[in-house]
């Protein structure tokens, strides 16, 4: 990988192609053996850090996948809270719940917010990405695919992945390793 001035490599960061998992070396580098169905290279965001992008889409001629991590006090505490939401269907629009959620997050200051599925088909997937994200919530936001998020295509999760990235991933907060996995089937 390449580093900007002042950036330092980080050893021990877990990186995966969806099948294989490796750790970065002391120079912050990694090598994956290759998995032909890989759609993303993603990393486990380590405790003490935040990132704007924990995954990168695989591109045919791309040889390097670099992730930018910034230190964050929010993801360090051993004891922390998080906000979990689910089934926030958007029939008739977002309504007042988004404003209420923003206020709740502002008051409680959770380490992160996670949406555990049923973002609700194409309209919901697109709308949530615009209104429930790290910038609008002022904390890291993670998404997990639900059965109402699988839409027609070669893979039911194609639209979800084009907006939110891989359906399998993990991150660390304090001394807890969180693993996000998809449901096994849709409607």
Predicted features along the sequence, with ranges:
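Short, acidic Ser/Thr/Gly-rich low-complexity loop/linker segments typical of extracellular
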Residues: 9-11, 16-33
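Short, solvent-exposed loop/turn elements at domain surfaces
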Residues: 24, 91-95, 151, 187
């Amino acid at each position: 990988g390449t580093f900007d001035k002042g950036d330092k490599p980080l050893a021990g960061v877990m990186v995966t192609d969806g099948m294989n998992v490796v750790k970065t070396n002391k120079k912050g580098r990694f090598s994956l053996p290759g998995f032909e169905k890989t759609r993303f290279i993603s990393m486990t965001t380590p405790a003490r850090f935040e990132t704007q992008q924990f995954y990168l889409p695989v591109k045919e001629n791309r040889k390097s996948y670099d992730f930018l991590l910034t230190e964050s006090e929010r993801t360090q505490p051993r004891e922390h809270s998080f906000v979990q939401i689910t089934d926030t269907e958007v029939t008739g629009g977002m309504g007042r719940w988004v404003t209420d959620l923003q206020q709740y997050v502002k008051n409680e200051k959770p380490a992160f917010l996670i949406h555990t599925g049923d973002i609700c088909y194409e309209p919901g997937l697109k709308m949530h990405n615009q209104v429930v994200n790290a910038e609008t919530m002022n904390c890291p936001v993670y998404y997990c695919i639900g059965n109402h998020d699988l839409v027609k295509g070669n893979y039911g999760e194609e639209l979800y992945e084009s907006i939110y990235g891989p359906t399998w991933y993990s991150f660390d907060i304090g001394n807890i390793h969180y693993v996000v996995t998809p449901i096994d089937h849709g409607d």
